[in-house]
């Protein structure tokens, strides 16, 4: 089975972008409270 680099990068970004967004949101919320 061939590995499609473009598909791999796309799926990686699809997982990574929301995760980073949630982490930033979480940090901002914590810094506001404390």
Swiss-Prot record:
Subcellular location: Cellular thylakoid membrane
Biological function: One of the components of the core complex of photosystem II (PSII). PSII is a light-driven water:plastoquinone oxidoreductase that uses light energy to abstract electrons from H(2)O, generating O(2) and a proton gradient subsequently used for ATP formation. It consists of a core antenna complex that captures photons, and an electron transfer chain that converts photonic excitation into a charge separation. This subunit is found at the monomer-monomer interface.
CC per GO annotation: photosystem II; plasma membrane-derived thylakoid membrane
Statement: the UniProt record of this protein carries the keyword Transcription regulation: no
NCBIfam families listed in its UniProt record: PS_II_psbM
Entry keyword set: Membrane, Photosynthesis, Photosystem II, Reaction center, Thylakoid, Transmembrane, Transmembrane helix
Protein name per Swiss-Prot or TrEMBL: Photosystem II reaction center protein M
Keyword Transmembrane among UniProt keywords: yes
Protein family according to the UniProt entry: Belongs to the PsbM family.
TM region positions: 7-27
Major place of residence: membrane
Mode of membrane association: Single-pass membrane protein
Self-association and partners: PSII is composed of 1 copy each of membrane proteins PsbA, PsbB, PsbC, PsbD, PsbE, PsbF, PsbH, PsbI, PsbJ, PsbK, PsbL, PsbM, PsbT, PsbX, PsbY, PsbZ, Psb30/Ycf12, peripheral proteins PsbO, CyanoQ (PsbQ), PsbU, PsbV and a large number of cofactors. It forms dimeric complexes.
């Amino acid at each position: 089975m061939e590995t499609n680099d473009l598909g791999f990068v796309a799926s990686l970004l699809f997982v990574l972008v929301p995760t980073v967004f949630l982490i930033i949101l979480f940090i901002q919320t914590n810094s506001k409270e404390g």
